[in-house]
Design a protein with these regions (language model features):
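Domain-core detector
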Residues: 1-54, 60-119
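Functional cores of ribonucleases/endoribonucleases
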Residues: 11-14, 18-26, 32, 113-166
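Catalytic nucleophile-His microenvironment captured as a short glycine-rich beta-strand/loop
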Residues: 54-60, 156-161
Length: 166
């Protein structure tokens, strides 16, 4: 319990805008700790800590991530070319993007725009933790998309959070 008290004391000394590296202790429990292992979180948007009564995860204060240096993002162009603009997916996204002035030929531009904004916003702590899947933590980032009439549309986008800023 002494080490747990130290962990909680260290945690309580953090400010909401501090960044931490989450380190999970290997275990056989069916918990989310492993999915956060090695991930960077801003304190105000990090998972509940401790995760459970037997949690031995540690938080280490780190410097704020720097885009393209200590943090990276990836958005496969196929998210647009083969999903959003595909005729086989009738989910309304294609017509929405087309109404905003985008077409399949803009897939690379959209991918770059999403990556750039997601990375900048993640590193600024401007994201929301949305839970986990079977393998990793999930976050939501609002992408501000310029549209053909000159206005901006804000779109919720989902991202997987991987260890060490990926």
């Amino acid at each position: 319990t002494e080490s747990l008290e130290k962990l909680l004391c260290d945690f309580l000394s953090l400010n909401e805008n501090d960044w931490v590296l989450w380190t999970a202790q290997p275990n056989d429990w069916n918990d989310d700790c492993d999915k956060f292992n090695g991930c960077f979180f801003v304190v105000k948007n990090m998972p509940r800590y401790p995760q459970h009564a037997n949690c031995r995860c540690t938080l280490k204060k780190i410097n704020q991530p720097v885009p393209y240096v200590t943090a990276n993002a990836d958005c496969d162009i196929r998210k647009f070319s083969e999903y959003i603009f595909a005729d086989t997916h009738n989910n309304g996204k294609k017509s929405l993007f087309e109404n905003w002035g985008y077409a399949k030929k803009d897939s690379e531009l959209l991918s770059q725009l999403f990556v750039s904004q997601a990375l900048q916003k993640y590193c600024a702590g401007d994201y929301q933790l949305k839970g986990t899947n079977d393998f990793c933590a999930k976050i939501e980032i609002i992408i501000d998309l310029p549209v053909k009439n000159g206005s901006i549309r804000s779109i919720k986008s989902g991202w997987k959070l991987y260890p060490y800023g990926k």
